[in-house]
UniProtKB/Swiss-Prot annotation:
Keywords for the protein's UniProt record, in alphabetical order: Golgi apparatus, Membrane, Repeat, Transmembrane, Transmembrane helix
Motif (PPxY motif 2): 54-57
Polar residues: bias regions: 1-13
Protein name in the entry: NEDD4 family-interacting protein 1
Organism field: Xenopus tropicalis
Length: 211
């Protein structure tokens, strides 16, 4: 009886196991050697696409140092013409310092009469004591008119006989010289006096007066 039961409960062979083994073998990853052989062409293709490669030793050693790179960067940030931005600041009018350098009509008339009445002494005093354009141009103009005055006095006075006898060209030279000095001082002051109106809307300008 026991033998019949043992034969009845014999272990059956699993029929699914042989089928799972081929599937497991197909799911296993391929060996590394086969992957390396198949993908070597792909890696070579990526290199040919232009990916950056490290520079050679010669190129790496020829690169600028850190100090040179910083110096180049600092030079690039420096403007080509330094200090020019201050020269282009718009101005509404001349300031007080510019007005003192130009002067006014009162200074011009004062130095004019000083040079005219006191001749060359008044000219040197008024020219050296004043630093404005009006004062110096007034001194020049007054000295020119004073020179004309003395030429006429010497020419037509009976107290100085024989000064221009036979030398009338010298009389004309001094007369023309005095007239030119008078006109130069008067005309130049008239031009300088109009500068505040002409330069009021222009950028800041440095003006050099040549007397």
């Amino acid at each position: 009886m026991s033998e019949q039961s043992s034969s009845r409960y014999q272990q059956l062979q699993n029929e699914e196991e042989p089928g799972e083994n081929p599937q497991a073998s197909t799911d296993a990853p391929p060996p590394y050697s086969s992957i390396a052989g198949e993908s070597s062409g792909l890696f070579d293709y990526k290199d040919e696409l232009g990916f950056p490669k490290p520079p050679s030793y010669n190129v790496a050693t020829s690169l600028p140092s850190y100090d040179e790179a910083e110096r180049t960067k600092a030079e690039a940030t420096i403007p080509l013409v330094p200090g020019r931005d201050d020269d282009f600041v718009a101005r509404d009018d001349f300031d007080d310092a510019d007005q003192l350098r130009i002067g006014n009509d009162g200074i011009f008339m004062l130095t004019f009469f000083m040079a005219f009445l006191f001749n060359w002494i008044g000219f040197f005093l008024s020219f050296c004591l004043t630093s404005s354009a009006a004062g110096r141009y007034g001194a020049i103009s007054g000295f020119g008119l004073s020179l004309i005055k003395w030429i006429l006095i010497v020419r037509f006075s009976t107290y100085f006989p024989g000064y221009f006898d036979g030398q009338y060209w010298l009389w004309w030279v001094f007369l023309v010289l005095g007239f030119l000095l008078f006109l130069r001082g008067f005309i130049n002051y008239a031009k300088v006096r109009k500068m505040p109106d002409n330069f009021s809307t222009l950028p800041r300008t440095r003006v050099l007066f040549i007397y």
